[in-house]
Amino acid sequence: MESNFNQEGVPRPSYVFSADPIARPSEINFDGIKLDLSHEFSLVAPNTEANSFESKDYLQVCLRIRPFTQSEKELESEGCVHILDSQTVVLKEPQCILGRLSEKSSGQMAQKFSFSKVFGPATTQKEFFQGCIMQPVKDLLKGQSRLIFTYGLTNSGKTYTFQGTEENIGILPRTLNVLFDSLQERLYTKMNLKPHRSREYLRLSSEQEKEEIASKSALLRQIKEVTVHNDSDDTLYGSLTNSLNISEFEESIKDYEQANLNMANSIKFSVWVSFFEIYNEYIYDLFVPVSSKFQKRKMLRLSQDVKGYSFIKDLQWIQVSDSKEAYRLLKLGIKHQSVAFTKLNNASSRSHSIFTVKILQIEDSEMSRVIRVSELSLCDLAGSERTMKTQNEGERLRETGNINTSLLTLGKCINVLKNSEKSKFQQHVPFRESKLTHYFQSFFNGKGKICMIVNISQCYLAYDETLNVLKFSAIAQKVCVPDTLNSSQEKLFGPVKSSQDVSLDSNSNSKILNVKRATISWENSLEDLMEDEDLVEELENAEETQNVETKLLDEDLDKTLEENKAFISHEEKRKLLDLIEDLKKKLINEKKEKLTLEFKIREEVTQEFTQYWAQREADFKETLLQEREILEENAERRLAIFKDLVGKCDTREEAAKDICATKVETEETHNYVGFEDIIDSLQDNVADIKKQAEIAHLYIASLPDPQEATACLELKFNQIKAELAKTKGELIKTKEELKKRENESDSLIQELETSNKKIITQNQRIKELINIIDQKEDTINEFQNLKSHMENTFKCNDKADTSSLIINNKLICNETVEVPKDSKSKICSERKRVNENELQQDEPPAKKGSIHVSSAITEDQKKSEEVRPNIAEIEDIRVLQENNEGLRAFLLTIENELKNEKEEKAELNKQIVHFQQELSLSEKKNLTLSKEVQQIQSNYDIAIAELHVQKSKNQEQEEKIMKLSNEIETATRSITNNVSQIKLMHTKIDELRTLDSVSQISNIDLLNLRDLSNGSEEDNLPNTQLDLLGNDYLVSKQVKEYRIQEPNRENSFHSSIEAIWEECKEIVKASSKKSHQIEELEQQIEKLQAEVKGYKDENNRLKEKEHKNQDDLLKEKETLIQQLKEELQEKNVTLDVQIQHVVEGKRALSELTQGVTCYKAKIKELETILETQKVECSHSAKLEQDILEKESIILKLERNLKEFQEHLQDSVKNTKDLNVKELKLKEEITQLTNNLQDMKHLLQLKEEEEETNRQETEKLKEELSASSARTQNLKADLQRKEEDYADLKEKLTDAKKQIKQVQKEVSVMRDEDKLLRIKINELEKKKNQCSQELDMKQRTIQQLKEQLNNQKVEEAIQQYERACKDLNVKEKIIEDMRMTLEEQEQTQVEQDQVLEAKLEEVERLATELEKWKEKCNDLETKNNQRSNKEHENNTDVLGKLTNLQDELQESEQKYNADRKKWLEEKMMLITQAKEAENIRNKEMKKYAEDRERFFKQQNEMEILTAQLTEKDSDLQKWREERDQLVAALEIQLKALISSNVQKDNEIEQLKRIISETSKIETQIMDIKPKRISSADPDKLQTEPLSTSFEISRNKIEDGSVVLDSCEVSTENDQSTRFPKPELEIQFTPLQPNKMAVKHPGCTTPVTVKIPKARKRKSNEMEEDLVKCENKKNATPRTNLKFPISDDRNSSVKKEQKVAIRPSSKKTYSLRSQASIIGVNLATKKKEGTLQKFGDFLQHSPSILQSKAKKIIETMSSSKLSNVEASKENVSQPKRAKRKLYTSEISSPIDISGQVILMDQKMKESDHQIIKRRLRTKTAK
C-alpha cells in the first residue's frame, strides 16, 4: 500500500493554509538558491517525483499527406514532400517562384522533419485509424482521457480524416463503432447517472430522467425529419456498417475483450455524447437547432471547475445506446455546422468543431456507483488561410481572421510550453487568449494525453504554408504533456471493491489533490491563479468537506461491511481499518512536510528576487554616472575651444607688423581662397545631388509593383484557362446531347413503326365488327316488324272480350318491355304451380303480385263455385301466356345479343379514341422530331459561329505572341546596346584613371601646398624665413619679432582647418564605399548578361518544340477529319431511315382518316336507332295516359304516373344533355378531321423542307466535320499556345524586371557621368586658378625681392598690417562657413531620413569627389614646388582634357540618341500591349455576351419543352375526361333503359291490379246479399270494401299488395296472418326531410317536415345501443310463422335497389292456437297498430328516429273512435300467456339509417334474451 500511495503522479497541491498549525522552521539554509534543488525534493518525496517524470509523455504527432487532385496532377508531376521512412519526411524547396511567397530562398534546398508516425497519400482510412487512433480508443475504454485534434491548411483533408464520406468513413464513426462493438452487453441502459462539468456526475431523479428521454426522442425526431428530405439514415448506417465489416475490427475487439475480462462483470458503461463548435470565438451547441423566430443560436459559456479543468456550461449531453444513434446525432450536428464556399475549398469548415464522448464506469449493484469518468475529445480544427489565395471578403474574411488568431494562440501556447521546460523560470502560457486554447488548457495541464494529426498537401503552390505547418508540428512534438489525472485516478480508485461513489458534493480527495500550486508546479496561465483570500476560503471549505466525507466514508464502509458479512471476515475488517488509519497519518505527515518545503522555496525565491533587484539598481546607477561624465567632458571641451578662439582674436589685434609675416600671410590667404572655392563647389554638388535624388525617388514611386503586375497577369491567365475549360465542357455536352437526340429519334421511329402495325390490325378488326353490327341490325329490324304485327293482332281481339283484353294488354306490355330472364322464368313457374294446386284442390286461383302476393279469401267453397265458369278462359289465357313466354325468351336472347353488340361498339369506340390518341401522339412526336432537327441545325450554326470566333481569337493570340516575341527580341537588343554603352563608359573611366596617374606629378606640388596650409608642422616657417634672410639680411630682425606673435594666430587657424580636414576624410570614406558598390553592380550586370544568354537558348528550344508540336497536330487533325467523315456518313444513313419511317407514318394517318369517316357514318346510324327507340318510349307513355283517362276511379295511379313523368322529364333532360354532348363530340371530330387535313398539308410542306434540309444537313455535316476537326486542332493549339503565352508572359515579366534594373543602372551611370563631368570642369577651373595663383605668386616674389632691395621697412609694415586685417576678415568668413557647414549637416541628416534608398549613390559620389580633391591638392603642391618646369606639362594635360571633354560630349550625344530610340521603342511596346489588352477585353466581352445568349437560348428551350410537356399532359387529361364522359353517358343510357324496363313492369303490375280489383268488385256485388243475411252485418259491409281499397292503395303506392287482417291465404297448407294497416307513410330518398302521412279515412296524404337529427356522441351512442337492444327484446314476437313464397323471394331479389317498407310484425292477443281462423280474425286489438308502427319505425331510416313520437301522437286522435267501436262489437279473447312488450310505445328509435331490410327469420341471441325486460302490468 505504501508503494502505491507514494507513486502518485498528482500535481503537488498548496498546503499553505492547513487546519493543523505547523511551526515555521527556525533555521533554513539559503546558500544554494541557484543550485539544483532536485536533491532536496528527492529527499522529501523521491518516489512521487520519479513517477511524475515517468508519467510525462511527449505530444504524439501523426502526419498525413493528402494525394494530388486531378487539377494538381495536370499542373505538377512531383510534389515538394518526400517520405524517407515511417517517421521522417523531407520538404524540398520548389524551383519555381510561384511556390514561394517571398523571392528570397531560405538557404536550405531540403529540410527534414520527424514525426511519431507518417502516413503517405496511399494510406486508407482503415490503416490510418488502426495506426493512429486505435490506441487512444483502447485507453478510453481503460478509463483514461484523451484529446485528438487535426491541424493544417484549408483543403488539406482534415474534415475527410475526421468525418470521411459515406463510402470511406473517417475517424469519428469508426471510433463509435469500435466502442460499441467492444462494450456490447456491458452498456448501462438507465439514464439516472449523467456526466456533469469535466470529471463529475449527477444522479438524476425520475422526473429528470423522463426529461432526458423526452429530449433524446425529440432530437431523434429531428433527425427523422431531416432524413425525409435527404437520404434515409438506414441507408447511411447501412453504408457505414458495410464499410466497417466485422473483419476489420476483429483484432481490436479481441484486445478489448482481453482488457474487459480483467474487470468485474458488475461493471457497466454509460456512453454520453456532445457536439459543439467554436465559431468567431463564440461557442454553439450543434445539437440545438437555429430558432425560427430570431434566426440565432444560443451562445454557450466556457468556465472552469474548482480543479481548474475547463468545461462548457449548459452543453447538451445525450446518452447513446448504439453506434447507429451516435452516427445519426453526428449527422445532425454536421447539418448545423457552419460551412462556407471559398476559392480553395467548396465546403470549407468555418469553425472548430469538437465531438466529445464521455464514458461513466458504473458498478451496477443495488445502489449503482460511478467508479471512473473517462473522456475522448475529437476536434476538427478549421484550417489556416491566406487571403491572397482564398480571396475572401466580408464575413468570410472575418471568419478567417478569427480562425488564424485562434491557431496562432495555439502555436504560442505550444511554443511557450516547449521553452518553459528548458528554462528555470516558468513562463506565462496565454491559454485565455482564445476559446480553443482555453478548452485545451486542461489537457495540456495533465487531464490526459494529446494526439495531434497534421494534414498537409504535397502541392508546390502551398510550399510556404506547409513549411510553417511542419515547423509548428516539430515544435509541438517536443512538448511534454503530463498525464497526472489518469494516473491519479488509477491510484485513487484502485480495484472495484474499494472504489467510492463520487458525486457533485462529495469529491474532496480529487479536489485537494488537483488544486494547482503556483510554486512547485509553476502554473502555466496567470489567469488561472487565484487570489490568496479565495485560496484560503476554498482550501478551508475543501478540508471541512474532506473531514465530513471521511466520516461519511467510514460510515459507508461500516455499512457495506455489515451487509457483506458472509464474504468478508473480521480479520479483513481490522486490516482495512488499520490501513485507513495509516493512510490518514501519512496524509497528515505529508501535509506537514509539504508545508515546510513550500515555505523554504518561497523564502528562497524572495531572496533571489531581492538580490536580482539590487543588482539591477546598481547597474542603472553606474550607467547614469558614465553618461553624466561624458556629457560634462564634452561641455568642457566645447568651452575650451570657445575660449581659445576668443583669445586668439584679441592677440591678433595687438600684434605688430612684419614684412616677412605679410608674405607668409599672403601665401596663406591664397590657400584659404582655394578652400573657400572647394566649399562652394561642395554646396553646389550637394544641391545637385538633392535634386537628382528627388527625381529618382519620384520615378521609383511612379513605377508599379512587379508583384502586383505579375499577380494581375496570373489572374487573367487563370480566367482564360477556366473559360477555355468551360468551352470544352460545353462542346462535349453538345456532342452528348446530339448523340442522345439521335438515339431518341431512332426510338421514336421504332415506336412509329409499331404503332402503324397496331393501327392496321385494329382497322381490320373494326371492319369485321362493322359487318357483324350490320347483320345484327337487320335481325333487330325483323324482330321489330314481328312485334308490330303481334300488337295489331292483340288490338283486334280487344273488341271481342273485355276481360281477356286486360290480360292481353298486360301480356303485350310484357312483350314490349325488356325484362331480365331470371325474374320472368320464376314468375311463369310460380303461376304454373299455383294453377296446378288449384286444379287438384278445385279451388279458385290465387291472386298474384310482383312484390307481395297476398290474395285472401274468406269462404273457399263459395268462391270456387263462382269462379268455375272462368276456368276455360283461364286455360286460353295460359296458352297465350306460354306463347308469350316463348316469344319473351326469344326477345331476351335478342336483347342480350344487342347488349353484347353495344358493348362491342363501346369497345370499338374506345379503340377508335385510343387510336386517335396514338395518332395525336405520333403527330406530336413528329413535331418534336422536326423541332429537334431544327435545334440541331441551330446548334450546328452556333457551333460554326463559335468555331469562327475561336479561329479569330486564335489568330489574334498568335499575333499577340508574335508581337510579344518581337518585343522580347527588341528588349534583348536594347539590353545588349545598353551593355555595350556601359562597357564604353567603363573604358572611358579607365582612361580617366590612367590620366590620373599622369597627373601625379602635379599632385606632388598640391601636396606641398596642403602641407603649407596644415599648421601642425612648425618647420615650414623657419625654412621660409631662411629663404628671406638669404635675399635681405635687414628684414631678419622684423621677422624675428613677427615669429613671437605669429604662433598664437596660427594655432587657432590650424584647429579650424583640422576640423574641416576631418570632414573631408569622412567624405573620402563614403566615396570608397560607393566605389565598392559600383564594382558589385558591374558583377550583377555580368550575371544579367549570362541570364539573357540562357533565356535566348530557352527561346530557341521552345521554337523547336513548337515546330514539332505543329507537325503532331497536323497528323492528329487528319485522323480526326477522317473519323468525322465516317460519323457523318452513318448519320446520313440514319436520317434516310427516319425519313422512310415518316412516310410510312403519313400513310398510316391517311388510313386512319378513312377509318374515322367510316366510324362517323356508323355513329349516325346508331343515332337514328336511338331516336326510333325514343319514339317507341313516347308511344308507350301515351298508352299509359290513355289508360289513366279511362280509369278515373284510381286517383293515386295518376299521381304515381306524374312522378314517373317527372323522372321521364329528367331522363329527357339527360338525353338532351347527351345530345348536346354528342353534338360537341361531333364538332370535335370535325375539328380533328380539319386538323388532320392541316397536318397532311404540313407534312407535305415538311417533306419538301426536309428534302431541302437534307441537302443543307449534308453540307452542314461536311462543314461540321471540317469545323469540328478544326476546332479540336485549334483547341489543342490554343492550349499549347496558352501555355507558351504563359511562359512568354513570365519571361516578359522577368525581362521587364531586368530592363528596369538595367535602366536603373544606366540612370545611375548617367548620373555618375554627369558628376564626373562636373568634377572635371571643377578640376579644370581649379587648375586655371592654381596657374593664375602661381603666376601671381611668382610676380609677388619678384616684387618682394625688388621691394626688399629698393623699398624700406615701413612699406613692409604697412603690408603686414593689411595682411593682418585680411586675416581677421578671413577668420570671420571661416566661422560663417562653419555655421553653414553645421546647417548643411542638419539638412543632410533630414535628407538621409527622406532618401534612405539613395544614400549609397550619394556616398559613391562623395568618395569620388574626395579622390579628385586629393588629386587636386597633390597637383597644387607639385605646382608650387615645380612651377617653372610644369607649365609645359600643364599645357599638355589641358590639351588632353579638352580632347576628353570632346569625346565625352560625343558619347553623351550618342547616348541621348540611343536613349530616345529606346524610349520610343518602349512607348511603342506599351501602346501595342495596351491595344492587345483592349482587343482581348473586347473578345472576352463578346465571348461573355455569346455565352449569355447561349444560356438564354437554353433556358428558353427548357421553358418551351416544359410548356410542351404541360400541353401534352393537358391533352391527355382532356382525352381521359372525354373517355370518362363517354363511359358515363353509356352508363346513363343503360340506366335509362333499365328504368324504362322497370316502369313497364310497374305499368303491368298496375294493370293486373286493376283487373283483379274489377273482378273482386263483381264478386263482392254478388256476395253482398248473402253476407247481409248472416251475422254481424256492419262488419260484413265495412271490412271488405276497406280491405280491398287498402289493398289497391298499398299496391299503387308501395308496389306491393298487403292483405287485410281478417283474410287468410292458404298456400301449401300454411296459414299466414297479416295486420290491417292503420296508417300509410310515404317518403323518398331524394327528399329525406319530407314524409307523406295518410290516415285511413282521408283520401289525400298530409306532408310532414322532419328536421335533421343531431349527431350524438360516442357515449350516448353506446347507451342508446343498450336501450335499443332492450326495446327490441321487449317487443313480443309472434308465434305464427308466415310462409314466404318463392314469388316473394323472387320479388325481393328483383327490387333490392328500392327501399322496401316492411309490414309491422306485432300480432294481437289470441284466445288459443286451435280456435277457428275466422273467429280469431274477428277478435283483434286496435292497440297493436301503434306498436306495429313503432316496430316499423325501428327498422326505418335514421330520419324518422327523432320524430317518431310526434307522428304517433298525431295519429292517436283519429284512431280512438275505431278502437272503441271494435271493443264494443268484438268480445275480448282470453289471455293464454303474458307476452313481453315495451311499455313506452312512442320511445325514440335508435337504428342506423343504412339498415332498410331486416331479416324476418333472425333469432335472438342468449345475450339479448338476458337483456330483455318484463313489461309492466297494465290495468284492465
Swiss-Prot record:
Signal peptide: none
Residue positions, PTM Phosphothreonine: T560, T1644
Primary location group: nucleus
Region ranges (Disordered): 829-866, 1247-1275, 1760-1781
One Gene Ontology cellular component annotation held by this UniProt entry: growth cone
Binding annotation for ATP: G152, L153, T154, N155, S156, G157, K158, T159
Compositionally biased spans, kind Basic and acidic residues: 1247-1264
Keywords: ATP-binding, Cell cycle, Cell division, Cell projection, Coiled coil, Cytoplasm, Cytoskeleton, Microtubule, Mitosis, Motor protein, Nucleotide-binding, Nucleus, Oncogene, Phosphoprotein
GO terms, molecular function: ATP binding; ATP hydrolysis activity; microtubule binding; microtubule motor activity; plus-end-directed microtubule motor activity; protein homodimerization activity; WW domain binding
Region described as Necessary and sufficient for interaction with SHTN1: spans on this chain: 1050-1107
InterPro entries named in the record: KIF11-like, Kinesin_motor_CS, Kinesin_motor_dom, Kinesin_motor_dom_sf, P-loop_NTPase
Feature: compositional bias, Polar residues: 1265-1274, 1760-1772
Annotated ranges, domain Kinesin motor: 58-479
PTM entry text: Phosphorylated during mitosis by CDK1.
SUPFAM superfamilies, per the entry: P-loop containing nucleoside triphosphate hydrolases
Region (Interaction with PIN1): 1560-1820
One GO-annotated biological process of the protein: positive regulation of intracellular protein transport
Stated family: Belongs to the TRAFAC class myosin-kinesin ATPase superfamily. Kinesin family.
Function comment: Plus-end-directed motor enzyme that is required for completion of cytokinesis. Required for proper midbody organization and abscission in polarized cortical stem cells. Plays a role in the regulation of neuronal polarization by mediating the transport of specific cargos. Participates in the mobilization of SHTN1 and in the accumulation of PIP3 in the growth cone of primary hippocampal neurons in a tubulin and actin-dependent manner.
PANTHER family cross-referenced by the UniProt entry: KINESIN FAMILY MEMBER 20B (PTHR47970:SF29), KINESIN-LIKE PROTEIN KIF11 (PTHR47970)
Protein name, per record: Kinesin-like protein KIF20B
Organism: Homo sapiens
Originating gene: KIF20B
